[in-house]
Regions:
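Structural hallmark of WD40 beta-propellers
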Residues: 86-89, 108, 128-132, 153, ...
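Per-blade loop-tip surfaces of WD-repeat and WD-like beta-propellers in eukaryotic adaptors/scaffolds
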Residues: 100-108, 138-153, 183-201, 235-248, ...
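Surface loop/turn motifs at the tips and blade-to-blade linkers of beta-strand repeat domains
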Residues: 71-72, 111-113, 156-159, 203-207, ...
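EF-hand Ca2+-binding helix-loop-helix modules
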Residues: 722-766, 803, 808-846
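EF-hand and EF-hand-like Ca2+-sensor regions
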Residues: 802-846, 861, 865-870, 881-953
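Canonical WD40 repeat/beta-propeller blade segments in eukaryotic WD-repeat proteins
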Residues: 76-81, 117-122, 161-169, 209-217, ...
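Intrinsically disordered, low-complexity acidic/Ser/Thr/Pro-rich linker and tail segments
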Residues: 2-101, 234, 280, 286-290, ...
């Protein structure tokens, strides 16, 4: 230990520091920046419901998808010890969930309520109350009862312009302070125990104060607070008169940035550590004025140690520090070393939390207030997600948690056992028993090359004997699933292409991998080892999925790959599946009919069934619409708990995990989803019994285990109603709305049109219309399908029962029409952004403010050459209808008259009605005749599409 020395004087001389104050009175009118807006709330009856400490946590598993376990820790947030007497219980965060972990019983109680990652949390001095907050645009602060695990109060939109970066309870836990993440940061104090939705005090900090990221109350005085950043410390005071004092120290510390500060336990002082091993002691006085700068004789600099101090806290008249070496030191108020813990084998320390009770009774003579006492157990967390418990009386410690501290992109379930493999970007691999909740085997880079990022893994399909692991370097290793060891002969390195997908064949004899170079690599088991067969570049854009199947006429495996280029590829064929949508994933559809189908999900919220032999689209269905398209799907195995005998599909979107009842039919009530990883899902897998789904969160360094309840999903689906009732909710106005009446009118008009508009015979009403009327009817309902989409739609109805009856369907009723319309139309219509993108791709800058414009001749050429090319007759018919042109006389050539100006009246030429330069507004309003839209029709600056994108789309 280093005592104060002469070097401290030099440090003081090199520092520039100041301290000033701000006062503001309680008043309703606004005050200037840096002053406080006081909002007085009447005292109301408290909302906190007391629960006994021995009450059990209650978990709600009556939802289709419920969170069961969180594997992983947010290492940037502190870990708090809640109980350390008969049971060891502590609190930490992972992703958007708070976790109360009972180490004694190996159980978790999960604090769910946030839709964004938890950015900060705190506990009260008595460990009774917990506060969690996030940084979403609609930031939320939730206060929890640590005994029951239920939320007791929620603050919505408390910092809407950036979220919350720090929170803290007052010493008596009656108030809560929040520090915002806004551009101009705000500090708010809340009377949370009452029905409070507005802060008692609020101030906006000046930019020169720097970015504050930490705030606490003085535990002995609830009218005093401090906040700090890496370069500044602010002190606040609220008194009965309503004044709010702010002390600011601005300096440039020679040794390094500051760490979070604390209050002295007895004196009116603030202790501020630095990354240079220095502690600054601020002696404050009660007679400071607003914006006053503290003189130098009020600041003491103590050079405590050589290594950076990352954590400083005070407990029982002791000063406790944690540093970058993972050491914990205890000092008295004179900075004399009392004890130390240097053998914890930790990386830089993030937090130190002490138990609220002693291991045994100390100091019965009542000298605890004056003498330092080393009697409380504590937990220490590190930057690498390790949590260690230290028993002070026995001077022993044990590791409580050693979780992932790197992004997770690989997860796979064993085909026969309750085991799931998890791999992260540091090359670490773990196998976890999701029934007993403990790790079975770990491979922390042993046998794996250092620096390898583990991107994908999968178990062999039969007994799970092998575990194939793919790395970002392009390497593929075959590991023994029981030992996680590999034979050097079964480690294949093909740099530098990253492995993105892996799949075993049904007989576990083949393994296929997809790499970032758009190719597929194939391996085969040739006893006694795996061998490399070859690599095939099957796509010209990234591969989104690959899948093994079995030939219908043999037991030989066949391999399918799916790409962003919209191609479905196997060794025998290649077929373009979509015109504009991008397929995201695929899987085998369960045998619900005599045909074998591949189900493919696209970025347009659609799911399509393709015949595995003919590759024709047999059905188009509306998929889950929960904010982002489905990116991965899997058919869950039938379990013993599945009383209905139905089939189910699990899926993940960008940030959600969900469950879908099969068969797919577009019913929105047959699907449920919940937020799983707000920062994005990187991988998912499901258990062999279909009762658990696992999601990897990538950058949030967590794997979440989700328990499935099929009965809850079936119950939710039943609430949606029968027959067409669920589909009416997807129509504007519902069953009794104007749009539904329009559908009925058009439906019966199609019957009249089919019977002849000028027919004088008695009309024969029918519950069905012929399929020939379907394309026109869809366009009348403002859905404009392409010719390929029309063909898919007609085939879907025409061949709907062909495999069962051998007959074609030639007509359709109103109920089937409504389902067909809902499933085929764009899920969210045509957006202005899509039109803007099209003009950016096709046009050239030349309009006002650099907006893209399209040349008239260029547009006509594109319509006749690209995509589904139109003939001149079709163009003439379209523009005649759009512009209301008169019909051409019988003795005139319609093709020549419409496109040429020779010997033709000006009223029939395109030049007279279409401007030479076409902007987005002209195309939308003048040509298409659509109503004026919002100002959102503004192209993104600096963006220009390419001909390659045009060819693809």
């Amino acid at each position: 230990m280093k005592t104060p020395c002469a070097d401290a004087t030099k440090i003081v001389q090199q520092m520039k520091y100041s301290l000033h104050f701000i006062f503001a009175s309680k008043q309703k009118s606004d005050v200037t920046i840096g002053e406080f807006h006081t909002k007085v709330k009447q005292q109301q009856k408290g909302l906190v419901v007391l629960v006994e400490e021995d009450d059990c946590f209650v978990s709600d598993k009556n939802t289709p998808v419920s969170l069961d376990w969180v594997s992983g820790v947010n290492s940037s947030l502190p870990v708090y010890i809640l109980q350390d007497h008969s049971q060891l219980v502590f609190l930490y965060a992972g992703a958007h969930v708070g976790i109360i972990y009972n180490h004694t019983s190996n159980s978790q109680h999960l604090l769910q309520g946030h839709c964004s990652p938890i950015s900060c949390m705190c506990v009260s001095e008595d460990r009774r109350w917990i506060g969690t907050a996030d940084q979403n645009k609609k930031s939320t602060v939730i206060l929890w009862d640590s005994y029951s695990g239920i939320p007791v109060h929620t603050l919505f939109d408390c910092h809407p312009n950036g979220g919350v970066i720090a929170i803290a309870f007052s010493g008596d836990a009656k108030q809560l302070v929040t520090l915002g993440n806004e551009r101009a940061q705000c500090v708010c104090i809340w009377d949370w125990t009452n029905d409070c939705h507005e802060p008692l005090w609020l101030t906006e900090l000046r930019p020169e104060y720097g970015y504050q990221n930490y705030v606490i109350y003085n535990p002995n005085n609830s009218t005093q607070l401090l906040s700090s950043s890496e370069s500044q410390v602010l002190f606040y005071s609220t008194v009965s008169s309503g004044t709010f004092d702010l002390y600011c120290e601005t300096h440039k510390l020679a040794g390094g940035p500051l760490s979070p500060s604390v209050f002295h336990w007895r004196e009116f002082r603030i202790l501020t550590p630095s990354r240079a091993g220095v502690i600054m002691v601020w002696d404050l006085t009660q007679d400071l004025d607003s914006n006053q700068r503290l003189s130098r004789d009020h600041v003491k600099i103590i050079s405590l140690q050589e290594h950076p101090i990352t954590v400083l806290t005070v407990v029982d008249n002791c000063i406790v520090t944690g540093d970058t070496r993972g050491h914990v030191n205890f000092y008295d108020e004179n900075m004399l070393l009392l004890t130390w813990f240097t053998q914890l084998n930790l990386d830089p320390i993030v937090s130190i939390s002490f138990s609220k009770e002693f291991e045994r009774e100390y100091l019965e003579d009542g000298t605890l207030d004056t003498k330092p006492v080393l009697g409380r157990n504590f937990v220490v967390s590190s930057s690498t997600s390790a949590v260690v418990h230290v028993n002070m009386e026995r001077s022993t410690w044990r590791v409580l948690l050693q979780e992932n501290c790197d992004p997770l992109h690989a997860v796979a379930c064993h085909p026969k056992q309750p085991a799931v493999a998890m791999g992260n970007c540091s090359g670490s691999l773990k196998i976890w028993d999701y029934r007993e909740k403990h790790h079975l085997r770990c491979n922390l880079k042993s046998g794996l090359k250092d620096g390898f990022e583990l991107n994908a893994d999968t178990f062999s399909s039969r007994a799970g004997r092998y575990l194939a692991v793919g790395f970002a370097s392009g390497a593929v290793h075959f590991l023994d699933a029981n030992t996680l060891q590999s034979d050097p002969k079964e480690c294949f390195d093909y740099p530098p292409d990253s492995i993105s997908h892996m799949s075993f064949s049904h007989d576990s004899r083949y393994l296929a991998t997809a790499v970032s170079c758009l190719a597929v690599t194939l391996f085969r088991m040739q006893q006694p080892q795996w061998i490399y067969l070859g690599r095939y570049r099957s796509h010209y854009k990234p591969i989104t999925d690959l899948l093994f199947g079995v030939h219908q006429d043999s037991s030989k495996p066949r391999l399918f790959t799916l790409g962003v280029d919209r191609l479905l590829v196997s060794l025998q064929f290649s077929k373009r599946l979509e015109q504009s949508a991008v397929p995201k994933c695929m899987t085998w559809y369960p045998p619900l009919s005599s045909e074998e189908f591949l189900v493919v999900a696209s970025d347009q919220y659609k799911m399509k069934l393709f015949n595995s032999m003919s590759k024709t689209c047999r059905k188009t269905l509306l998929g889950p619409t929960y904010g982002s398209p489905v990116k991965k799907i899997g058919i869950l195995p039938t379990s013993e708990n599945n009383e209905s005998g139905s089939h189910y599909m699990a899926y993940v979107t960008e940030d959600k995990v969900g469950l879908q009842i099969l068969p797919l039919d577009g019913n929105p009530y047959k699907s449920q989803a919940v937020v799983c990883h707000p920062t994005g899902v990187s991988a998912f897998a499901y258990s062999h019994d279909g009762l658990f789904v696992f999601t990897a969160g990538g950058p949030d360094c967590t794997v979440l285990s989700w328990q499935i309840s099929y009965s809850a999903l079936e119950g939710a689906a039943a609430l949606g109603g029968k027959e067409l009732e669920p589909y009416y909710t997807l129509l504007e106005g519902g069953r009794n709305g104007e749009f539904y009446r329009e559908i009925e009118d058009f439906f019966y008009y199609c019957q009249i049109h089919n019977q002849g508009l000028e027919s004088m015979e008695t009309r024969q009403l029918s519950p069905k219309i012929p399929l020939t009327e379907l394309p026109s009817l869809m366009r009348a309902l403002a859905y404009f399908p392409t010719e390929e989409e029309v063909e898919d739609m007609l085939n879907e109805v025409k061949l709907g029962q062909y495999t069962e009856t051998g007959e074609y369907i030639t007509d359709i009723n109103l109920a089937e029409l409504i389902k067909l319309y809902i499933n085929h139309r764009p899920a969210f219509g045509i957006s202005a952004e899509e039109l803007i993108t099209a003009f950016e791709v096709l046009g050239e800058p030349g309009g006002p403010a650099g907006k893209p414009v399209l040349d008239r001749d260029r547009m006509l050429e594109l319509l006749q050459v690209r995509g589904e090319a139109m003939s001149e007759d079709e163009l003439a018919e379209c523009f005649t209808g759009l512009f209301g042109l008169f019909e051409v006389k019988e003795d005139e050539n319609p093709e020549a008259d419409f496109f040429k100006t020779d010997n033709v009246s000006q009223e029939y030429t395109l030049e007279s009605v279409i401007p030479e330069k076409i902007s987005i507004e002209i195309f939308t309003h003048h040509i298409l005749g659509l109503p004026s839209s919002s100002p959102s029709l503004t192209p993104k600056k600096g963006h220009k599409g390419s001909e390659q994108q045009l060819d693809d789309d």
